[in-house]
Amino acid sequence: MNKEYERPEAHDEIPAKISELISLAESAELSKENGIYQNIPGGDMPGDHININEQAILAAKRLFPLIREKLVSTVRSNPYGRAVISVSGGSGSGKTCLSALTAWYLNKCNVGTRIISGDNYVHRIPEENDAERLRIFRHNGIRAMVESGQFDNIIFERLQSYQKEQNETGHAKDIEEPWFKTYIEGGKAALDQHLGSSNEQNFEMLNDIISAFKDGAKELWLRRMGRDNTALWYEKADMTDTHVLILEWTHGLSKHLSGIDERIFIRTTPEETYASRIGRSRDENAKTDFIQAVIAIEQTQLTKLIPSADLIINRAGEQLSKDDFD
């Protein structure tokens, strides 16, 4: 990334403004009646919708005392008064709402804050990404059968019938034959290697953006990804008065991601994740067995990464102990 960019002057008053965050959060009235409730802007993912409710507001209010000290010290130590926070968690964990509320409150304190969605930095558009995941699952499932000596034409015809139904993972609990178990396990093992890897996610581009922001860049080109291959573009973002960058992303704890000052993780149950996903307009396929298998693998991966978080909370914003996840 080009580092010959204009840099703003540092703002010494920003730490004091951040310190006002808690009192503002406690006094600000967010409700369905006053209209603010529905008009809080979300992130920068095209077509994304947020559903802010009372639980999300309570979680945000509980979060502020937990992040204020670290946020103030980080802003003070950066020559441009800047800090980067990641809000991560499983799909449907509430990270979009929490990020939106945190940004809204900070902006109300005149601490310029911008949200970027990591979902804009997948290598492939959603439809192609889902297709690639399915290809990897099927290819490696069949390879596992071949390598274990469990593949023949008769078995392949049976497998194809399940594949044409787009539901082989849905049959996993019903078919107990060894060859099918090998297929499912081989496919899932390959998915585990692919999901959240640099083959799927463009960590390099995100790391460049984070680095440039902390280095004082006044402008950044941010990626936008819609639902099809005509909806992929870049927008120039004015960062002159932005002091906090919130990365809202499932993979905010990834070892491939650098430059994050405070990593926040929202711990949810599989039931909470499922209920949230099916209620979102951009997740029409959330109920499919294959997507549920993908979510389960991602959830396992995220659980292993929880100890690397700086702060762990539940959906209600209550702090959880790291000792429970070591």
Label every PLM stretch briefly.
Residues 92:
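Walker A (P-loop) phosphate-binding loop of P-loop NTPases
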Residues 95:
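Conserved lysine of the Walker
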Residues 175-182, 231-280:
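ATP-dependent NMP and nucleoside kinases share a basic, alpha-helical "lid"
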Residues 98, 102:
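Hydrophobic positions on the alpha1 helix immediately C-terminal to the Walker A/P-loop
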Residues 113-114, 121-229:
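Conserved nucleotide-sensing/catalytic segment adjacent to the nucleotide-binding pocket
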Residues 1-78, 262-265, 275-283, 299-326:
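NTP-dependent small-molecule kinase module
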Residues 104-114:
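Post-Walker A helix-loop "phosphate-sensing" segment adjacent to the P-loop in P-loop NTPases
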Residues 136-139, 189-195, 257-258, 262-302, ...:
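A glycine- and Lys/Arg-enriched "phosphate-lid" helix/loop adjacent to the NTP-binding pocket
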